[in-house]
Amino acid sequence: WESKYTININTQMNYWPAEANALPECVEPLERMVAELARTGADVARRMYGAPGWVVHHNTDLWRQAAPIDGAQWGLWPMGGAWLLQHLWDRWDYGREPGYLEKVWPLFRGAAEFFAATLVEDPASGAMVTAPSISPENPHPHGASLCAGPSMDAQILRDLFDRCIAIAGLLGVDADLSARLATLRERLPPHRIGRAGQLQEWQQDWDMEAPEMDHRHVSHLYALHPSSQINVRDTPELAAAARRSLEIRGDEATGWGIGWRLNLWARLRDAGRAYKVLGMLLGPERTYPNLFDAHPPFQIDGNFGGTAGITEMLLQSWGDTVFLLPALPPAWPQGRVSGLRVRGAGEVALEWDAGLLRQARLQARHGGRFRIEYREQPLELELQPGEVATVVPMGGRLFRLA
């Protein structure tokens, strides 16, 4: 809007397919933008909050403005920079390039230092929360959007603190900061399940009273995608609550909103629903004849969100595991794909027939340990740099071919 970058979902969605689809060079301009935002954001942190580090709100532009803009119901949200940093973590995790973490560590450290200085204790729960903030861009049922500690903020902070602790450990630096962040992480508000069985969007159980229950944003489901804090394998109860939230929200949305829902259904391993939502995204109401995504009007976020969603249906890489064909719909009974990347600097090719995996090939760029899973059957691989492993299913298990 107005030739600016909206960084409470839209800019991020544009980069969702980059790493997995072997386009890491496309992230370089975003990395430069984050470094520039850290400079303007440091001025905002100092002058607006009296805090160290740096902060960016929901929108920026060519001049890298970092303060809140437009209405409070959109702008007074301090998590934009922290979310963008997840793409820099992904750039390392998918590529594992030597020296990269040293380059970006000051950006992560500065963002963490800001929140370590500005989180406040919720007198009702004792949790450490952002305040004031909003749940982008959804109003709550009290005629306002401002609140303390919306679910999305805590979810982004969990990822930020975890990344900082991991990077500091790998680099052997800032042990005191890591210890402080670990303590703060334990005091963030937990995921909460509301009275309708949904994942709560706010600390309070307001979801069923919100004036826009079918809102285009699904901010509180960040933990399901693009994060993996909530997933069907490790947190099934929370995954069921996220599913309930999606059902309440509905599939109809803007083009990019449908793109986000596609990725969420893929993470829930609901192949049929993901395929249905993909059909909505590519239908005439949300895709123009030239395949441009329709917000409306044209908004490319939905194109890239859809690309990422198709990838997620075929291959997922989160936590410590590579998931093969996790949400393959019956409409795609056979096919193959190659050149997809996974965390740990691996490259994967897949072939399937009659809806079943035929084989997978994984090549390790730098070597290391990989965990592959197909239909809940895991296989551990230890590979040397450049080594290729071919994996096939037999008798309900995965085997590596000699």
What does each model-identified segment do?
Residues 117, 272-401:
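Non-catalytic C-terminal accessory modules of carbohydrate-active enzymes
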Residues 103, 120-131, 173-177, 324:
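Short, glycine/acidic-rich hinge or "gate" loops at secondary-structure transitions
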Residues 2-4:
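Segments forming glycine/polar-rich beta-alpha architectures that bind adenosine-containing cofactors
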